[in-house]
């Protein structure tokens, strides 16, 4: 399943963008679940995570395209200027929403990294490709392995950490017109996931081991964020009057002789709870 990319819109709504198993990129209201728009890319799943670049959403897939037999494509989709209101129909975006396409890109589940207007994507041929997010043109290409399936690159500390299917991981620096490998090693087991970074360390999971690279100093103790600090995502000053109701829980199972209590919240047009 595609990792979600969240965005807070000027109108107060919080949305997320994702690929779907039916070949679409979708925009969903994160508070209410309302589907706002969709754009079909392929006849198979869009399994990689999408990237937000200014007023576009960039996505890549590794299936057959809807308008040709070409396999794989990276596309920049322009976000619509206005979105449906509560209860209105989903927007179906067509080719007019396509800003650019790059037919040389094919990735099954690898999610691009994004930094300063550039996309860094590993593709099926085992290459790391730097793409200009404004134009869709390749900036540079590095061959790092025979092939690639699932793993994704990570941008951290001014460098790219790039795991590959054959167990190799490379540290790459973007030098403008080219990419340069600072170092590389081969790990035990295939790399299928994206690395993670925290407290000066990089964590890499293979099919056989979990590796930690970086600072030998003890990491600070983990402190969970108090739930109160996250309340602004659901509640806040109302924007207008209530426009919809939210029943909680939305999903439940009852056995004979049991009961279920519900809460009903009034939501404003941004999906925030304003009254119980």
Feature-to-residue mapping (PLM):
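Noncatalytic, solvent-exposed loop/strand surfaces
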Residues: 1-247, 252, 256-263, 269
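Short flexible loop/turn segments that cap and initiate beta-strands
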Residues: 267-276
């Amino acid at each position: 399943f595609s990792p979600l990319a969240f965005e807070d819109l000027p109108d107060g709504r919080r949305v997320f963008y994702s690929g779907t198993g039916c070949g679409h990129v979708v925009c969903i209201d994160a508070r209410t679940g309302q589907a706002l728009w969709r754009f079909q890319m392929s006849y198979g799943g869009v399994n990689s995570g999408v990237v937000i670049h200014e007023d576009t959403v960039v996505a890549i897939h590794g299936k057959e395209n809807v308008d040709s037999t070409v396999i794989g494509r990276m596309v920049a989709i322009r976000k619509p200027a206005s979105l449906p209101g509560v209860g209105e129909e989903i927007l179906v975006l067509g080719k007019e929403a396509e800003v650019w396409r790059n037919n040389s890109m094919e990735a099954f589940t690898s999610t691009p990294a994004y930094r300063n207007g550039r996309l860094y994507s590993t593709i099926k041929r085992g290459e790391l490709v730097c793409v200009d997010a404004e134009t869709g043109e390749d900036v540079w290409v590095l061959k790092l392995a025979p092939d690639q399936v699932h793993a994704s690159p990570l941008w951290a500390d001014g460098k790219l950490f790039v795991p590959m299917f054959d167990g190799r991981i490379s540290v790459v620096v973007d030098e403008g017109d080219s990419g340069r490998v600072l170092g590389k090693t081969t790990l035990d087991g295939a790399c299928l996931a994206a690395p993670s970074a925290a407290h000066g360390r990089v964590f890499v999971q293979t099919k056989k081991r979990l590796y930690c690279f970086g600072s030998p100093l003890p990491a600070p103790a983990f402190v969970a964020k108090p739930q109160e600090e996250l309340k602004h995502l659901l509640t806040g000053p109302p924007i207008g009057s209530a426009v919809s109701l939210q029943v909680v829980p939305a999903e439940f199972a009852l056995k004979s002789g049991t009961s279920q209590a519900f809460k009903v919240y009034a939501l404003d047009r941004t999906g925030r709870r304003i009254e119980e």
